Amino acid sequence: MENTLVKSLYRDTDKYAGQTVQVSGWIRNLRDSKAFGFIELNDGSFFKSVQIVFDTELDNFKEIAKLPLSSSVKVEGKVIVTPGAKQPFEIKAEKIDIEGLSDSDYPLQKKRHTFEYLRTIAHLRPRTNAFSATFRVRSIAAFAIHQFFQERGFVHVHTPIITGSDTEGAGEMFRVTTQDLNNVPKGEDGQVDESKDFFGKETNLTVSGQLNAEAYALAFRDVYTFGPTFRAENSNTTRHAAEFWMVEPEIAFAELGDVMNLTEDMLKYAMKYVLEHAPEEMEFFNSFVDKTVLERMNNVINSDFGRITYTEAIKVLQESGADFKYPVEWGIDLQTEHERYLSEEIFKRPVFVTDYPKDIKAFYMRLNDDGKTVAATDLLVPGIGELIGGSQREERMDVLVDRIKELGMNEEDYWWYLELRKYGGTKHAGFGLGFERFLMYITGMANIRDVIPFPRTPGSSEF
């Protein structure tokens, strides 16, 4: 008999009512008495489990009644509609085959476990309700983002993981080397001889695919990358990880306003898609993780995002009378408390802050006519603060070279990036969305380690 997915049974119960079906999955819960028993079976296709009713008519009743949690079984039985019960239907088992026994020391027993404990068994945590919901939403949200860009004719670019340049100029990068670390070749000056390494120069894991995406935007017009990025930042916070995923679109013949419009459209599209395609998971988050999740998402979807310049924002914050922990001064980056105040108290909706001081932003952002600010924007959202950062890129070769020199960066590392301005360069813009931060926002999960399947953080590279 062909296997039927539990998702299909829930989505089309009337079609299967009274029919004999075969389902296979893992035992989430089992209760039994002398004459009958109940199994909660989850097959991974759906957030909810299906209830299997079995009794002494089964030849192996006693064996089934003693099965440990997480044992895998294959069940044949009749679909019985149960309109008055908790679940809309159950399966009356006619045959249960044991596919794989679980040892009795299976760590996910019936009691609730803390997220902190579940991180120590990251290979098993997707079997819990919270993480089943989280990682299905992660999958659905990723698909939504791809679909958004594909529907609009964007080209998906696979940018390199290993790079010879630092997009952010931050220097917090993971080195890539094949050198024998106990016998590193050195030059006459006592420094490491990079020419003897695999690539013949210093290379690192990428912190962003943006620079490479810009090259493709100047050929395909509209492109995006969606891939892993790495920061060797020794931050043990709930918002930082050493490995995370970034969504980075890049659009040619575009200015800052165009990229803000794109940002707003993409966020609303992805949120609507998740609400539509993961209703059970989102209801779970709203009930058990963060009771404001659905309200927050609907606020974003139904709002016109606000816009304010950094200079105006500083003035508003200074005149607010609010007691901030960190000072509010022109030239200093906004802290989370400032960002949240703007989005939650002043605008009460998402807001773009634009035109930041050049000294607190990256080298590639377009210098404004005032010579002090750049065409950059951060999207601030209620409940979290900054969610997305974007900018118009500097298309003027001389201005870009001056900026690289001003920051003490090595111009030679960016020869190809500068050359893009030499051969038909045009105005272009883009943004970066930390995918995990987006997931934290829509699920209410408070720690970035809980929205990445196998998190990589300082001192932690298990699994």
Swiss-Prot record:
Superkingdom of origin organism: Bacteria
EC number: 6.1.1.22
Family matches, as InterPro entries: Aa-tRNA-synt_II, aa-tRNA-synth_II, aa-tRNA-synth_II/BPL/LPL, Asn-tRNA-ligase, Asp/Asn-tRNA-synth_IIb, NA-bd_OB-fold, NA-bd_OB_tRNA
Broadest EC class assigned to this enzyme: ligase
GO (cellular component) term, any one: cytoplasm
Location within or outside the cell: Cytoplasm
Spans traversing the lipid bilayer: none
Reactions accelerated catalytically: tRNA(Asn) + L-asparagine + ATP = L-asparaginyl-tRNA(Asn) + AMP + diphosphate + H(+)
Molecular-function GO terms, alphabetical: asparagine-tRNA ligase activity; ATP binding; catalytic activity, acting on a protein; nucleic acid binding; transferase activity
One Pfam family this sequence matches: tRNA_anti-codon
CDD domains: AsxRS_core, EcAsnRS_like_N
GO biological process terms, semicolon-separated: asparaginyl-tRNA aminoacylation
Signal peptide span: none
Predominant location category: cytoplasm
Keywords tagged on the record: Aminoacyl-tRNA synthetase, ATP-binding, Cytoplasm, Ligase, Nucleotide-binding, Protein biosynthesis
Family: Belongs to the class-II aminoacyl-tRNA synthetase family.
Assembly, per entry: Homodimer.
Protein name: Asparagine--tRNA ligase
Gene name tied to this protein: asnS
